[in-house]
């Protein structure tokens, strides 16, 4: 057997694996690129999309939401192929590296929309091609990146796994926080407040910051591409620090999948998916319908008029607050009265998420009546939505990882991503269905949000009935199986993503 210059099993150490900083750095830059692009996609399609002649050719909100959620659904469906390539053919490292290059190409296609090339190629074609490439890139690496974190750990340092998953989650939210503030600002025209801080920086600085060239689609879509290139470089630099779990080969892989035991494991892990998918059908709308709603609200807060696509920045802020609060205070307190299994956390999160959409529906009722409510009400809805996310997303992710046999980690992780894909496809289907030929929609205003409230409540009730019947096992990278209770003692992990 040929020797490899890379580690193929976790080293027997009790400290942090040496490859972790590269993985976390890669994830922070990649999440900056994705969430930056993601934050402006809906608003770009509804406000700034042009045709080849340079005329405004925007999409109606329902159509833009359908496009957006179809893109996200495709992105989260493709990881199944990345998982097979990673586990059976090439290994996780090479799949992440090469598909990251496709990812960069997708960002480049979106950046071309703001260049003279858009006068020769229809911008909607560039948009579609770019989104397809990004879906392939982001989707292909998703089952590999978070499992690559787990692959770095063995029995001797497994106690650090949850801590690293928390840092991993922190890097996601740090990247998304910065990008969702900056990238929308680069897309929208900017005029400095004559009495503000920027106006006192000098004419040359103010002129640069107000330049139409700076605030353009090619810059707004191009900067995320630069960060994706940085993420790819950081990942390459860490290649000799990582544990490279060898691919098992297609024959072994097929044998592992197509047997009775693995079939039962996959079916068990799929149990939460139909319920969690509805959570994602609601959560992902903070990038679509919530942004469109914010356009009709008074966005003055703390002396600043925020852009509608910047309001979602509060989500990573609340996540960074709620993660330690839930993990170190709320959960230990509640454990004194009731056993908090992962599935119970998920069930509670489903009910909480329904409450967030009820708040948004009440906001929309005021807008429909002609009022212009303060954006602080949507911020409160984000507080509730983020609480639901904290309960559902990281718990389900780590749950999925620990339930996967050693040779099938990436494939089992796809069940988590499948829930996101199906949830977005559900929302896309709703938005396609409600469009009438005359341009009107069947679910208008508050009725649209209330529809999702009732769907989420029904899902949550059904989940509380079904979840007690779940039986499963916990697996780690250097163990064949850990026999335990029906549910593993998992804590916080990481959202890929949304």
Predicted segments with their positions:
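Interfacial helix-cap and linker-helix signal at transmembrane-aqueous boundaries
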Residues: 45-46, 85-89, 117, 182-191, ...
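Conserved MFS/SLC helix-loop-helix module at the cytosolic interface between two early adjacent transmembrane helices
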Residues: 79-102, 108
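C-terminal ends and interior cores of transmembrane alpha-helices
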Residues: 96-125, 348-370
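A gly/Pro-rich, aromatic-decorated transmembrane alpha-helix motif that marks the paired
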Residues: 39, 77-84, 111-112, 174-189, ...
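Central cavity-lining transmembrane alpha-helices of secondary-active solute carriers
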Residues: 66-87, 174-179, 313-328, 422-425
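C-terminal transmembrane bundle
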Residues: 316, 328-478
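Intracellular loop-helix junctions on the cytosolic face of multi-pass helical membrane proteins
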Residues: 1-25, 155-162, 166, 171, ...
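Helix-loop boundary and gating motifs at the non-cytosolic
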Residues: 14-73, 271, 280-293
């Amino acid at each position: 057997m040929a020797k490899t210059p890379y580690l193929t099993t976790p080293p027997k150490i009790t400290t942090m694996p040496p490859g972790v900083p590269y993985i976390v750095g890669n994830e922070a830059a990649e999440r900056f690129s994705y969430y930056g692009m993601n934050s402006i996609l809906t608003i770009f399609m509804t406000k700034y999309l042009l045709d080849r002649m340079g005329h405004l050719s925007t999409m109606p909100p329902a159509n833009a939401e359908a496009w957006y959620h179809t893109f996200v659904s495709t992105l989260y469906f493709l990881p199944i192929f990345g998982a097979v390539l990673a586990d059976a053919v090439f290994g996780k490292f090479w799949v992440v590296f090469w598909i990251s290059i496709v990812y960069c190409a997708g960002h480049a296609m979106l950046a071309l929309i703001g260049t003279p090339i858009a006068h020769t190629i229809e911008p909607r074609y560039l948009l579609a091609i770019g989104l397809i490439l990004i879906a392939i890139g982001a989707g292909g690496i998703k089952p590999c990146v978070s499992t690559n974190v787990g692959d770095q750990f063995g029995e001797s340092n497994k106690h650090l796994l949850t801590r690293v998953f928390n840092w991993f989650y922190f890097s996601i939210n740090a990247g998304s926080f910065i990008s969702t503030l900056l990238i929308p600002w680069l897309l929208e025209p900017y005029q400095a407040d004559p009495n503000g801080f920027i106006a006192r920086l000098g004419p040359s600085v103010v002129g640069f910051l107000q330049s139409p060239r700076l605030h353009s689609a090619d810059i707004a879509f191009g900067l995320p591409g630069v960060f994706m290139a940085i993420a790819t470089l950081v990942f390459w630099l860490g290649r000799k620090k990582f544990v490279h779990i060898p691919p098992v080969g297609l024959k072994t892989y097929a044998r592992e999948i197509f047997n009775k035991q693995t079939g039962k494991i996959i079916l068990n892990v799929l149990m939460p998916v139909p319920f969690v998918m509805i959570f994602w059908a609601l959560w992902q709308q903070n990038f679509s319908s919530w942004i469109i709603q914010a356009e009709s609200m008074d966005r003055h807060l703390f002396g600043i008029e925020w852009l509608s696509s910047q309001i979602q920045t509060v989500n990573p802020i609340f996540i960074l607050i709620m993660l330690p609060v839930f993990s170190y205070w709320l959960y230990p307190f509640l454990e004194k009265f009731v056993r908090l299994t992962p599935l119970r956390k998920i069930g509670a999160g489903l009910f909480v998420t329904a409450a967030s959409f009820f708040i948004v529906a009440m906001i929309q009722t005021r807008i429909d009546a002609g009022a212009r409510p303060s954006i602080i009400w949507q911020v409160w809805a984000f507080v509730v939505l983020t609480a639901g996310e904290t309960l559902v997303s990281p718990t389900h992710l780590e749950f999925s990882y620990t339930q996967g046999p050693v040779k099938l980690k990436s494939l089992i992780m796809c069940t988590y991503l499948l829930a996101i894909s199906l949830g977005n496809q559900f929302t896309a289907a709703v938005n396609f269905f409600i469009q009438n030929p005359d341009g009107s929609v069947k679910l208008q205003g508050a009725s649209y949000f209330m529809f999702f409230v009732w769907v989420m409540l029904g899902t949550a009730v059904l989940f509380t009935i079904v979840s007690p019947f779940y039986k499963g096992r916990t697996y780690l990278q250097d163990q064949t199986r850990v026999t335990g209770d029906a549910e593993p003692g998992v804590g916080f992990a990481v959202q890929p993503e949304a």
